[in-house]
């Protein structure tokens, strides 16, 4: 399948020109800006950041990254700004429709984990509300910020961002007029102080736990509070606070039940059933509102910026005040810091892909997507809520948890599955610290929840409530067996033995647990739930088997490095046995692929008969790489079966325009029949699901790359699919954000669905299918710093001539790589910075190519030809900081 070309030119500019407005891009320190943080001076109504101050920051306009803009259907698109302690979601006109489905209609607005603060904040100029009475002309997404432009006699550029380390969101309005004006500026805010758990359908539910908010006015700010003890057994007393205010002193205020700007009176979403096409609030909401009014003098032709902050805390009003003051004291300084941090992220893993500029741009934005996914919460009260059926007393407290939020708006919390896949993208992007913190959080929660059994919790809300993943839950086997592999992944990319040692005991207990509790028939194939659960599946799942094989090899490697011969031998013996029996047990000739599961529980005589249902997990034997001592790293699948299975998955019964279906089409006993192509004769017991998740597509992209299949009809189909849903204006919802699900035959595009019935606007796991294929497979970066070595063996994709990457982080150093393929010559140029490791460089030969000569730094050199899953690799020992390899082909 050939990738479809992008329909419209990607809207991009080479710097955040207009981060605040055309003249106010980044706030640099200058004589015109406040020198210190702190609350604004109290006194003069009408004090603003004036045009002189705005002009002083123009020099910062080139220090940020690129921008993506949208001008069409802005009211149908979700907006998102994120920091590690707060985030906000509305639409791209600056309004705040009721959003999300975990607590229907309540997942948007302003949040600071684990607490929602506001349904929204609305701005009116001289009685005209921005986003409704004054239409939004353009929405722009940048690296760590967003901007909405409005026209009118007084033009407005609204810039939102969330400073990291602060429980607040900042909004800057930059006003500009051709004539002198005094503008009446109204700001409405509607509170909804509500924890991220319980949800709408759980017991107790969100409405039962939520208490009425109260509103007050003091010292120029609106203050909203919710305090008391909910009438729920085991609920604790709380004192939630949200504050709204400005760098400008208000001339008036009002309090009342509404104050939703143009969204009054509110359309209320029901708890369930069919919602209206548009809602403003939910039946669970118990918030209140307020208004602040300002008088702003706008000088002719000179921009005037007014800042607003939404801050809060689940601790106390005093804590909320501290967060508010940190935010509003010097917004420009915080904006500068945000831009500087995002520029540093952009500078790591900087790639040059002249043969695939769309993928290059996807690498850029995927790094930002990862940074946008970082969340942190404090004092998590760990309790097993048993899939929403109970609410026991907490078993303990995790003081601090930091993680990659799975997806916004409905999943911005701690998941094992998501974090484990996302870690591969994170190391490729150089974002080691959050990946480490994610694993620590999983360990800390899991050990409290499961009494140190070794089982990994699946889904943990920022309150500490664990929806699934306790010892009594039926499985999440795959997440538990993947954990040692992610520890090993980070150890190999960082060489951090302390981190290895910190997580080693838990990793050992992971695999001891699954053999003790999830192999009741002692056949070595683990029981329990995994990534896919559908009717008719056997109790032993393919993906759990694959990731167990990888986990055993990785645990053995960790054990060997610690001289733990007992665990090394135990894990190696288990892995050897599993790998010897795998192909015979799981391969199905008639399906041209692997069984999804074995051992039908409804048929005791099943005796491990394979069950084939065409799920995406059938690709995992080709996706997961196994590290075996003395052998090249390779997937579990045999090369012969991998070629057959990958060829099959590229066909229309499995692959659509944007990537891999969740469940392929073909003969089925399901009453709904087969809606698509048939590529085999096996009769499945379930219907197809032609929904294209960005994770499924990532799995396929990685699997293709593991076997050197980088061509236009192979890996590039899937890397292009994920890049397009993130960057193609004909496809995206939120510019630059990797979504959870692509527009698919069985999953229509989000933009046409109600805000309460959408998949995630930003989902971290899709970055796996962009960053890992480029860095690990195309650029060939394969560190093993735990053992003091690194291999850099690139493969230029078919139809291309060059791939390059710089500042690819390895441990405390980095590597630059350039690979070229032209005529009969392959060139690999490598520069190592700050690494004390043995370095091997090389290249993957084109299929059928033969070597005539090899030189290193201009001199003939010895080399090895190594047969790997990717193909034949030329490998050469490199010395020094820079190496230049030339391979001449016959």
Task: Locate the predicted segments by residue.
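Non-catalytic C-terminal accessory modules of carbohydrate-active enzymes
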Residues: 117, 124-159, 699, 706-890
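Active-site acid/base region of carbohydrate-active enzymes
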Residues: 235-260, 354-391, 429, 438-457, ...
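Short Pro-Gly-centered flexible turn/kink motifs
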Residues: 134-137, 173, 181-185, 295-319, ...
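Polysaccharide-binding surfaces and accessory modules of carbohydrate-active proteins
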Residues: 55-63, 147, 152-265, 290-292, ...
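Active-site core of glycosidic bond-cleaving carbohydrate-active enzymes
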Residues: 412-425, 429-436, 440-444, 501, ...
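An acidic-aromatic substrate-binding cleft motif
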Residues: 59, 63-65, 71, 328-406
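An extended acidic
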Residues: 48-150, 223-269, 341-355, 362, ...
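Secretory targeting and sorting signals
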Residues: 1-44
């Amino acid at each position: 399948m050939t990738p479809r070309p992008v329909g419209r030119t990607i809207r991009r500019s080479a710097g955040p020109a207009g981060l605040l407005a055309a003249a106010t891009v980044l706030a640099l320190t200058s004589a015109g800006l406040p020198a210190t943080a702190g609350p604004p001076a109290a006194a003069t109504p009408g004090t603003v950041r004036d045009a002189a101050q705005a002009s002083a920051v123009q020099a910062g306009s080139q220090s940020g990254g690129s921008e993506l803009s949208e001008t069409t259907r802005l009211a149908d698109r979700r907006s998102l700004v994120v920091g590690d302690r707060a985030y906000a979601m509305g639409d791209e006109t600056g309004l705040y429709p009721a959003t999300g489905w975990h607590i229907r209609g309540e997942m948007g607005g302003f949040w600071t984990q684990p607490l929602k603060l506001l349904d929204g904040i609305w701005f009116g100029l001289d009685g005209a509300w921005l986003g409704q009475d004054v239409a939004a002309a353009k929405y722009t997404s940048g690296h760590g910020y967003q901007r909405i432009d409005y026209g009118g006699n007084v033009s407005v550029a609204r810039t939102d961002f969330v400073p990291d380390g602060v429980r607040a969101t900042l909004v800057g309005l930059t006003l500009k007029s051709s004539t002198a004006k005094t503008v009446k500026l109204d700001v409405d805010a509607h509170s909804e102080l509500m924890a991220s758990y319980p949800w709408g359908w759980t017991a107790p539910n969100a409405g039962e736990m939520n208490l009425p908010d109260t509103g007050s006015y003091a010292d120029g700010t609106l203050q909203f509070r919710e305090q008391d003890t909910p009438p729920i057994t085991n609920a604790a007393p709380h004192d939630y606070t949200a504050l709204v205010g400005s760098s400008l002193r208000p001339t008036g205020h009002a309090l009342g039940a509404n104050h939703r700007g143009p969204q009054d009176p509110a359309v209320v979403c029901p708890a369930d059933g069919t919602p209206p096409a548009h809602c403003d609030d939910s039946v669970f909401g118990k918030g209140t509102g307020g208004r602040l009014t300002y008088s702003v003098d706008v000088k002719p032709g000179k921009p005037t910026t007014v800042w607003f902050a939404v801050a809060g805390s689940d601790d106390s009003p005093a804590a909320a005040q501290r967060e508010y003051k940190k935010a509003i004291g010097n917004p420009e300084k915080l904006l500068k810091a945000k831009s500087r941090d995002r520029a540093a992220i952009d500078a790591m893993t900087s790639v040059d892909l002249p043969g695939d500029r769309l993928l290059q741009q996807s690498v850029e934005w995927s790094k930002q997507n990862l940074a946008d996914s970082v969340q942190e919460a404090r004092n998590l009260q760990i309790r097993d809520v048993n899939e929403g059926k109970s609410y026991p007393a907490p078993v303990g407290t995790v003081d601090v948890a930091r993680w990659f939020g799975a997806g916004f708006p409905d999943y911005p919390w701690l998941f094992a599955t998501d974090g484990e896949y996302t870690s591969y993208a994170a190391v490729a992007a150089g974002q080691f610290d959050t990946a480490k913190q994610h694993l620590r959080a999983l360990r800390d929660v899991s050990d409290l929840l499961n009494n140190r059994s070794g089982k990994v919790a699946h889904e943990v809300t920022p309150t500490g409530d664990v929806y699934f993943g306790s010892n009594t839950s039926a499985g999440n086997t795959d997440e538990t067996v993947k954990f040692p592999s992610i520890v090993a992944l980070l150890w190999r990319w960082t060489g951090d033995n302390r981190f290895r040692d910190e997580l080693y005991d838990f990793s050992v207990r992971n695999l001891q647990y699954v053999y003790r509790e999830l192999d009741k028939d002692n056949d070595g194939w683990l029981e329990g739930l995994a990534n896919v659960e559908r009717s008719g599946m056997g109790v032993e799942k393919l993906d759990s088997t694959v990731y167990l094989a990888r986990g055993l090899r990785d645990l053995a490697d960790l054990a060997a490095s610690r001289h733990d011969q007992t665990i090394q031998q135990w894990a190696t013996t288990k892995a050897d046995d599993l790998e010897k029996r795998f192909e015979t047990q799981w391969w199905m000739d008639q399906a041209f692929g692997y069984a999804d599961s074995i051992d039908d529980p409804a048929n005791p005589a099943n005796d491990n008969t394979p069950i084939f249902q065409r799920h995406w997990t059938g690709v995992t034997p080709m996706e997961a790489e196994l590290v075996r001592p003395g052998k090249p790293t390779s997937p579990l699948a045999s090369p012969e079966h991998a070629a057959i299975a990958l060829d099959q998955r590229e066909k229309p019964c499995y692959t659509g325009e944007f990537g891999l279906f969740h469940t392929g089409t073909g003969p089925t006993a399901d009453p709904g029949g087969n809606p698509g192509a048939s590529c085999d004769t096996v009769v499945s017991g379930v219907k197809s699901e032609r929904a294209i998740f960005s994770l499924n597509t990532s799995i396929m992209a990685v699997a293709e790359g593991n076997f050197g299949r980088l061509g236009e009809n192979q890996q590039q189909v899937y890397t292009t699919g994920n890049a397009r849903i993130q960057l193609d204006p004909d496809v995206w919802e939120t510019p630059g954000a990797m979504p959870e699900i692509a527009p698919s035959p069985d999953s229509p595009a989000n933009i046409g669905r109600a805000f309460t019935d959408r998949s995630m606007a930003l989902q971290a796991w899709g970055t796996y299918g962009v960053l890992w294929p480029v860095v690990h497979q195309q650029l060939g970066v394969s560190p093993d710093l735990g053992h003091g070595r690194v291999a850099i063996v690139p493969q230029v994709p078919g139809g291309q001539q060059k791939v390059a990457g710089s500042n690819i982080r390895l441990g405390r150093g980095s590597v630059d790589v350039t690979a070229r393929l032209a005529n009969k010559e392959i060139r690999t140029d490598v520069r190592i910075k700050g690494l004390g490791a043995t370095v091997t460089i090389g290249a993957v030969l084109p299929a059928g190519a033969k070597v005539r000569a090899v030189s290193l730094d201009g001199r003939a050199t010895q080399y090895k030809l190594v047969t790997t899953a990717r193909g034949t690799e030329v490998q050469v020992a490199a010395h020094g900081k820079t190496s230049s390899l030339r391979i001449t082909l016959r």
